[in-house]
Amino acid sequence: MRKSMGITVFGCEQDEANAFRTLSPDFHIIPTLISDAISADNAKLAAGNQCISVGHKSEVSEATILALRKVGVKYISTRSIGCNHIDTTAAERMGISVGTVAYSPDSVADYALMLMLMAIRGAKSTIHAVAQQNFRLDCVRGKELRDMTVGVIGTGHIGQAVVKRLRGFGCRVLAYDNSRKIEADYVQLDELLKNSDIVTLHVPLCADTRHLIGQRQIGEMKQGAFLINTGRGALVDTGSLVEALGSGKLGGAALDVLEGEDQFVYTDCSQKVLDHPFLSQLLRMPNVIITPHTAYYTERVLRDTTEKTIRNCLNFERSLQHE
């Protein structure tokens, strides 16, 4: 009989816990499920397991990594595509490997298309009016994608999936990326901004892309253009965005991510007063759609992320056996 391997899963939400419990027997693993995010204080809960899993909102600092090393952890698998939340330099220095999971880009691509359609059809205003039993057509006349040019910034897996979907709508598609990864009409960023009716962001956040869309870039965009962001909040200078929306320079925005969202995303804040410089303004704007960083979140992605996390840990354990 194969010996079961243990994995300590930190920051484990109820739906993730159910997925781990369902899949664990198939892989002969024993998960220790902990709802609290990983920290230097609770790292000791991983004692006895060489592999742990963390969520993408868990900040894994140097102090936390040191605490993990002390209890014998050798591998951190984050349940996310990126690992900006982990001090990978400290992990490498302490001999702890870090792994990520890649999931299907379709969930985010579908969501980005949904947000585009909602934005250009004025869905927020329409839904609000109907909720008030106002069924008039005042100010609800929308636009059609086939009549528009869409600029896709970033043509990695998600950007490529977005381009593929847009072609089905018959609209013109422009693309910008540091490398040409697909057959597409690639242009420089300033040309994309000047010629796109919709701009959608699909690049990772790093020093070079922080505030990629700032005051100057917004100034280059077409009058009445729409901005869609399902990437990372800090890709956009939110202050400049709010100013452009208020002045009418931009026709609208649909944001699944927002700069400074860490204080409220994935939390019921209905009874709280949030100290965010722009959230309340954006929520009041009839042409702005805000959603809670949920573009990726589907049943398929939950299962895929859980399964790939388990496989990452199993593969790491096997690699140790062959050293």
Swiss-Prot record:
Pfam families: 2-Hacid_dh (PF00389), 2-Hacid_dh_C (PF02826). NAD(+) binds at residues 157-158, 230-232, 256, 293-296. Induction: By vancomycin, mediated by VanS/VanR. Its EC number is 1.1.1.-. The keyword Oxidoreductase applies. It comes from the Bacteria. SUPFAM superfamilies: Formate/glycerate dehydrogenase catalytic domain-like, NAD(P)-binding Rossmann-fold domains. GO terms for molecular function: D-lactate dehydrogenase activity; NAD binding. The active site is at 232, 261, 293 (proton donor). One of its GO terms (biological process) is cell wall organization. It is an enzyme of class 1 (oxidoreductase). Disulfide bonds: none annotated. Belongs to the D-isomer specific 2-hydroxyacid dehydrogenase family. This is D-specific alpha-keto acid dehydrogenase. It comes from Enterococcus faecalis (strain ATCC 700802 / V583). The gene is vanHB.
